[in-house]
Amino acid sequence: AALTTLSMEAQAIGAVNTIHFHNGAIRGYNTDYAGFGRLLENNGIEVQGKSAAVLGTGGVSRAVLQYLIDHGVSKIFLVSRNTQSIAPYMKTLCSSVPTQFVNYVHLERYTGDLLINCTPVGMYPKTDVSPVGLETVEHFETAVDLIYNPAKTLFLQQAEQLGKKAVNGMLMLVAQAVAAEEIWLQREISNDVILKVAAEMEKQL
């Protein structure tokens, strides 16, 4: 069946990962957006007026970019192995904010506030790799890795080694799932539940 309507964030991002049937209507949502927001909020990471480098141009990076734009990011570095292959819709998504499209080698030249890994590089079982080198991590204040297994990727280990703030993606995983439950149940779920579940899941890794 075709979707009847889209939530504002799903429409802006151009991707749906949750649907809700209500009174004959089918509404589409993107809960990665809310999940990423909860991840930042619970870790005290500010977006307003900050510059952010987003590694990767896949589906989750679209939600991350939209959240950053909606919450006042001042500049974006969208990082891809081949900047020529960045899809037009990604460029359109970033059009309201000063954006530079850079490859991984050239990213070493820039400095910024947030460095966000939206790629699977470093995920279990291939945990001995990082999407970027120490030279790049050194130029940013906070490293966010949306990977949650392992809890501390090589990328985050690099950040900690350099004295940077390092945050993994477990809380986002839980928060986006809870956001879907909130849509289906039509009620809010306490943030404490998200924190508790994320902590329990991290212990299992």
Residue ranges and their predicted role:
Residues V97-A166:
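Rossmann-like adenosine-cofactor binding region
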Residues D70-K75, Q161-K165:
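Conserved S-adenosyl-L-methionine
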Residues A1-N43, K152:
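Phosphate/diphosphate ligand-binding glycine-rich loop within oxidoreductases
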